[in-house]
């Protein structure tokens, strides 16, 4: 076993050859490199599979013999300065390694088909390989400086992947927004690291925890300063894990390709913030005020993310806000000191949410054949509906992922979320009420997404089935708001959206490729005014096997991964507890290992009842009773069921505006920060251009004219120049004499 640990340092570097070789190949041998494009995807999957096998072996060793293995090398720069780097293997590291590699492999397989049409296929796999290297280096780091180095690399990879389609202005703005927002948190993290080093003199985790605890116990340092350093450290995870108030980048990050959303913004990158808080929990736990701040940020994020997801029409943005809310649950658990529950939910949520994102990608991929290659249309749920019979496998996988996130047993997220809700009851009644209420909201908005996407009929062709001759249709904006626009009665929407029916022009390149495998056509014959009308309609088709296979594997994880936290005997033994022995849990310090099954079933019944209530409300409001686009809006659904529609209209309008406008937080940042900074920049530019440059240029121009004047007075004679020079010197000294 010791021999195995000695080679753990190589884990982050195994996927690195792919981005290096791809980058060099595209620069030096572009044609040959592009001809081997499928080889690069296979190599990426193969290398990451090696890391996964290595990680599984390390995890088994951790379960058998729970230990911490650290190996550090020292790089001495001079007698007073040296830098230490190495690797740190413990149960937390093993969990993150398995999570990164399993989800990463499945996303790479999925991407091989999903990105096959894109001209940036090789660039995509180069970025993915570099991102995997950065994440693996982050979770195996042995000190804070090493973590910060890989933390920044992860941020850079996120910037590149979110802005992968950088020719689209929206994607370019989204990656800049993500980069700048994360820089705020990263700056705080750097200040916190430097502050802790100034106090403790060490960056190594074990030394840092020991020195930090001794300083607080012996009261040898200012507690306020340590609290400030701890909060600055926490700023990094706030930004990286999209916690309030630095959450604004996550929904915009959905402008990247869907596989990126599954890997970075569901399973790994946003989990990096949770990982760092879990890694530094022995440091945070001795400062009660910081623990309360962590739990407070978590509970605010839970509620905010859930409410913002209520009125989203873009399927990926709805899932993004769901991710934000679920990360809040993990942060709440860490703030309560429930280390095991937080990491358990990190695992279950990662697989369930990756399944949902890949499912949404399959839906988008199928819808693109119908509505064209515009995210405004292919991701908009108001143009979907009735996909059950067209994409049955995707529908089944998406439904089970939705039920898991809702907390329905025996799916994965039920077990972990139930633990967090139970622990919140012990921590704070107010926090428990908010957490339980948000569990109901989660079930509501997740089932809303499912119903709008799969139930009813395909809304793209709705006007053709309604039987009404309407002179208007609904133009869907980026956020899904319907704006009624007048059009010609003879205007045909379908041929425009199908883009010549048999070929789809890539949204990102002029090259076309066939999409026959993703579309089916049906001919409808109708009788109007005694004449036969023949029209052909196109419907989405189930995705290819290379897209479905990763979804089915993630479906198995969603079904069975919760078993690692289920007690296997009367003593309460389970795999997760064995892996985290000894673990931190402030809420169950004096509890025995025996499982109170009565209490478990009571709490589970309560949480499942809340989830079913949310599902029932969503079903009542969004089940399509009749064919009308108006039925898909939250407002009109409440009007139909409410006895007092005016009050409901005001309430739901307020809620809709809150969700649609992102709780006005983006607007606040735009008005108070962005526009203020731009005004300040314009004023500084004016001062620099007109005042600073004006003075400099004025001196130069004055000297020029004085020289020209002198030249004409002197008549180009040296004696005249000498006389003028001496006269000026005499006048200068005379002036000084007068002043004195």
From Swiss-Prot:
One of its GO terms (biological process) is electron transport coupled proton transport. Its EC number is 7.1.1.-. One of its GO terms (cellular component) is chloroplast thylakoid membrane. It catalyses: a plastoquinone + NADH + (n+1) H(+)(in) = a plastoquinol + NAD(+) + n H(+)(out); a plastoquinone + NADPH + (n+1) H(+)(in) = a plastoquinol + NADP(+) + n H(+)(out). GO terms for molecular function: NADH dehydrogenase (ubiquinone) activity; quinone binding. It is found in: Plastid, Chloroplast thylakoid membrane. Its main location: plastid. NCBIfam families: NDH_I_L, PRK06590.1. Belongs to the complex I subunit 5 family. This is NAD(P)H-quinone oxidoreductase subunit 5, chloroplastic. The gene is ndhF.
């Amino acid at each position: 076993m010791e021999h195995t640990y000695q080679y753990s340092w190589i884990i982050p570097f195994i996927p690195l050859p792919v981005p290096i070789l791809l980058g060099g190949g595209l620069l030096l041998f572009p044609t040959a490199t592009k001809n081997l494009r499928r080889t690069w995807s296979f190599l990426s999957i193969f290398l990451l599979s090696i890391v996964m096998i290595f990680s599984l072996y390390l995890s088994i060793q951790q379960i058998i013999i729970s230990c911490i293995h650290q190996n550090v090398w020292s790089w001495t720069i001079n007698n007073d300065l040296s830098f230490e780097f190495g690797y740190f293997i413990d149960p937390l590291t093993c969990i993150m390694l398995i999570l990164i590699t399993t989800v990463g492999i499945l996303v790479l397989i999925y991407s091989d088909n999903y990105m096959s049409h894109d001209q940036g296929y090789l660039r995509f796999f180069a970025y993915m390989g570099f991102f995997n290297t950065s994440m693996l280096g982050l979770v195996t780091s042995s000190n804070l400086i090493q973590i910060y180095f890989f933390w920044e690399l992860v941020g850079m990879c996120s910037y590149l992947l979110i802005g992968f389609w950088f020719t689209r202005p929206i994607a370019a703005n989204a990656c800049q927004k993500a980069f700048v927002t994360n820089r705020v948190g990263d700056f705080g993290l750097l200040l916190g690291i430097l502050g802790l080093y100034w106090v403790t003199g060490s960056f190594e985790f074990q030394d840092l925890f020991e020195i930090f605890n001794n300083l607080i116990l012996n009261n040898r340092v200012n507690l306020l300063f340590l609290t400030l350093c701890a909060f600055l450290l926490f700023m990094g995870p706030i930004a990286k894990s999209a916690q309030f108030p630095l959450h604004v980048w996550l929904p915009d990050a959905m402008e990247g390709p869907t596989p990126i959303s599954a890997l970075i913004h569901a399973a790994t990158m946003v989990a990096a913030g949770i990982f760092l808080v879990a890694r530094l929990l022995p440091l945070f736990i001795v400062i009660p005020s910081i623990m309360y701040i962590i739990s407070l940020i978590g509970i605010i994020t839970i509620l905010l993310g859930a409410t913002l997801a209520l009125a989203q029409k873009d399927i990926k943005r709805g899932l993004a806000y769901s991710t934000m809310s679920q990360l809040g649950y993990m942060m709440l658990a860490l703030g309560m000191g429930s280390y095991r529950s937080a990491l358990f939910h990190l695992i279950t949520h990662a697989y369930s949410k990756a399944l949902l994102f890949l499912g949404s990608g399959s839906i988008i991929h199928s819808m693109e054949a119908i509505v064209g290659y515009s995210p405004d249309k292919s991701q908009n749920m108001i143009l979907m509906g009735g996909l059950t019979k067209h994409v049955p496998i995707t529908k089944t996988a998406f439904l089970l992922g939705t039920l898991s996130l809702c907390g329905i047993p025996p799916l994965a997220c039920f077990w972990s979320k139930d633990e967090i809700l139970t622990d919140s009851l012990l921590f704070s009644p107010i926090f428990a009420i908010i957490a339980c209420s948000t569990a109901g909201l989660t079930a509501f908005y997740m089932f809303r997404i499912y119903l709008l996407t799969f139930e009813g009929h395909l809304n793209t062709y709705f006007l053709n089935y309604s039987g009404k001759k309407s002179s208007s249709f609904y133009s869907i904006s980026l956020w899904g708001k319907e704006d009624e626009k007048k059009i010609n009665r003879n205007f045909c929407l379908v041929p425009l959206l199908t883009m010549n029916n048999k070929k789809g022009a890539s949204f990102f390149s002029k090259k076309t490729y066939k999409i026959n495998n993703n579309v089916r056509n049906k001919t409808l014959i109708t009788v109007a005014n005694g004449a036969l009308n023949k029209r052909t309609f196109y419907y989405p088709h189930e995705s290819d096997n290379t897209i479905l296979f990763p979804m089915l594997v993630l479906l198995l994880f969603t079904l069975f991964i919760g078993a690692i936290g289920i007690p296997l005997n009367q003593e309460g033994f389970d795999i997760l507890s064995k892996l985290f022995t000894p673990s931190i849990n402030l809420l169950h310090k004096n509890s025995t290992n025996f499982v109170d099954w009565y209490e478990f079933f009571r709490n589970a019944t309560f949480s499942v009842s809340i989830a079913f209530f949310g599902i029932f409300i969503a079903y009542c409001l969004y089940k399509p009773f009749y064919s009308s686009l108006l039925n898909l809006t939250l407002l009109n659904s409440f009007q139909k069921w409410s006895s007092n529609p005016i009050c409901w209209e005001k309430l739901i309008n307020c809620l809709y505006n809150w969700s649609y406008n992102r709780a006005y937080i983006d607007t606040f940042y735009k008005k108070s920060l962005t526009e203020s900074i731009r005004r300040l920049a314009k004023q500084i530019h004016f001062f620099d251009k007109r005042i600073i440059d004006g003075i400099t240029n004025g001196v130069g121009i004055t000297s020029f004219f004085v020289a020209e004047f002198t030249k004409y007075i002197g008549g180009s004679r040296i004696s005249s120049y000498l006389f003028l020079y001496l006269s000026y010197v005499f006048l200068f000294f005379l002036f000084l004499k007068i002043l004195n």
